[in-house]
């Protein structure tokens, strides 16, 4: 029997389910089959390879429930990075869901559409997928044991950019499909880990309009390394905008570590960020069951 939203039950993790009842908005087909595009020459991270999933035309979500005896009632939608070309689905996805479960947080892994669609903004299709995913989670909050008022997002690199754009969006970017689209898609908090594209590439110092910060932006946790080739100005400018808007935020810029480390430990202090993130969640009361 095919798995549907109605038949989804708690597991560790559940089987991935499609976000859309038919084709996703604007999809024209023609992509090769979805596949891991990893190459033998790719760099290792923390001594291990990184999955690089490409050609995603059927976006999905997979629910990773925290153990019942430690569950806090907090849920996080995880958005992997990959420049909007691929998804680092283990490094910045499944491994992150496992960590969130270890601190009592339910995780939902978003596999959004990549690569960039011709004739559209790089984030356009992924944003539709993220908006849809949040609506689905809130629609099924009771069935899945989710507190709809304690639902955040966590994104890496392009996934961090996606989270920021999601938080800034005024309305849905696609016509209503069903009841899931009647629920708010705005997250209650966000964690942006080495986010990309928040400022203009090549020297921008102010947050781009699509990621604009307002007093309605949710409380934010930011991490980056000073030697990140993406440029730490992304988090510095975003952090300053949060401060000016009086949005609660915590910003960590570490001396070294580069880009794309996920939460795998390395010699660089930046990879201790999960402990800082857990402290931040705890301080906000999100690691204590209501």
Residue ranges and their predicted role:
Residues 12-71:
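N-terminal cap/lid segment of alpha/beta-hydrolase-fold proteins
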Residues 72-81:
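Short beta-strand element of the alpha/beta-hydrolase
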Residues 80-85, 226:
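Active-site glycine-rich loops that stabilize anionic/oxyanionic intermediates
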Residues 87-90, 95-96, 110-145, 264-270:
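Catalytic nucleophile-loop/oxyanion-hole region of alpha/beta-hydrolase
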Residues 128-215:
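Primarily recognizes the serine-hydrolase "nucleophile elbow" in alpha/beta-hydrolase
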Residues 222-224:
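Short beta-strand/loop motif that positions the catalytic acidic residue
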Residues 229-236:
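Conserved alpha/beta-hydrolase "acid-adjacent" motif
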Residues 236-239, 243-290:
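C-terminal catalytic histidine-bearing segment of alpha/beta-hydrolase fold enzymes
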């Amino acid at each position: 029997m095919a798995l549907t939203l109605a038949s989804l039950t708690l597991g560790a993790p559940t089987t991935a389910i499609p976000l859309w009842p038919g084709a996703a908005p604007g999809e024209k087909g023609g992509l090769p089959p979805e596949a891991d595009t990893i190459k033998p020459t790719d760099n290792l991270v923390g001594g291990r390879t990184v999955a690089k999933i490409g050609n995603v035309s059927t976006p999905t979500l997979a629910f990773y429930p925290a153990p019942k005896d430690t569950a806090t009632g907090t849920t996080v939608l995880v958005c992997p990075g990959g420049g909007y070309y691929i998804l680092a689905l283990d490094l910045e996805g499944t491994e992150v869901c496992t960590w969130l479960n270890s601190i009592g947080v339910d995780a939902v892994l978003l596999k959004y559409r990549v690569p960039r669609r011709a004739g559209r903004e790089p984030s356009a299709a992924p944003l539709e997928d993220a908006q849809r995913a949040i609506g689905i989670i809130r629609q099924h909050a009771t069935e899945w044991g989710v507190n709809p008022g304690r639902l955040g997002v966590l994104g890496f690199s392009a996934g961090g950019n996606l989270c920021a754009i999601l938080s800034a969006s005024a309305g849905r970017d696609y016509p209503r499909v069903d009841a899931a689209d009647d629920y708010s898609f705005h997250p209650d908090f966000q964690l942006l880990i080495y986010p990309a594209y928040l400022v203009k590439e090549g020297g921008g110092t102010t947050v781009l309009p699509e990621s604009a910060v307002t007093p309605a932006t949710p409380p934010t946790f930011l991490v980056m390394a000073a030697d990140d080739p993406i440029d730490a100005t992304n988090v510095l400018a975003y952090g300053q905008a949060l401060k000016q808007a009086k949005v609660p935020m915590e910003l960590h810029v570490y001396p070294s570590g580069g880009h794309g480390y996920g939460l795998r430990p390395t010699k660089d202090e930046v990879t201790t960020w999960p402990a800082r993130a857990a402290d931040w969640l705890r301080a906000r009361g999100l690691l204590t069951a209501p």
